[in-house]
Amino acid sequence: MEVKICGLRHPVQAQAIAALGFTTLGFICVEASPRYVSPREIELVLQSLTAHDKLSTIGVFANVSLPKLREFLAQTSLNGIQLHGDESPDFCGQVKQAFPQHRLIKALRLRRSADLERAEAYYNAVDVLLLDAYHPEQLGGTGQTLPWQKLQQFRPPLPWWLAGGLTPSNVQEALNLLQPDGIDLSSGVEQGPADKDLAKVAQLRAQLDALAILQH
């Protein structure tokens, strides 16, 4: 199972997180977010991680135009794109065509379990679906969990990741109920926006080791 630690900003923290075995790292590229990082800040982090190979580095965008996305990515060496806004399946397909070398993740923010019906429209447009909790004012990192029991029948024909309020304290409960292909944590392992709590990240590693599911 893949584990993404999202909302990184500080090179030293990113190095420590990678050293713990977390090789999927997320960077918030939405200017309105308190976790926003500029292309230059992202590159400073990535340059500090050259000792770690096979990293998956994902930029998180929301409702960005294709030209703006192209401009941002041209300034970084990110190898993944996460769309976390109201992007249509058609737009996702355009992004996939424009950036075929980048893994494309589409986040669906669920207000109710019936919102899962929207997922099918994205099956052929993206590489990964991510399920997150809906918040009217925040796109992610809200600390709110999804109703895990209601997701037990979700079996899309492509990889899917679970997000939304995951912490070292509840990750085992979530994974005892569900079998996602990945999980995504942000606020659950930080002490402030984009300021990761390395003790919590280590606790997360210990919890996942107990389940023997962390992908190496």
What is each residue range found by the language model?
Residues 1-216:
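Conserved N-terminal beta1-alpha1 strand-loop-helix module at the mouth
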